[in-house]
Amino acid sequence: MKTPKELALLAARALSDKKGKEIQALEIADLTTLADYFVLATGSSNTQINALVDNVEKVLHEEAGEEPLHREGYRGGTWVLLDYGCIAVHVF
């Protein structure tokens, strides 16, 4: 089982692999109980945003056995949230 930090770094790598921009992994455990890390990235189009999110889901499933607890905004494609409990991935 991966730590929250390891999951956040895996998500950041998955975003980088698909050319995500402005990628940041922010430790927020001391600030809120929502998650331990927020992972943020931007994409250049709705299509790229969906590709970024798909790759995060693929990598976290294959390398950590993790599935998102919740996914929001995927159909709209302008902002997507993946909630993994200990990390939240935001792609704009």
For the regions a protein language model found, what residue spans apply to each?
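Polybasic/polar functional segments that serve as interface/processing modules
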Residues: M1-L34, G43-V80
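C-terminal structural segments of small proteins and small subunits
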Residues: L81, H90-F92
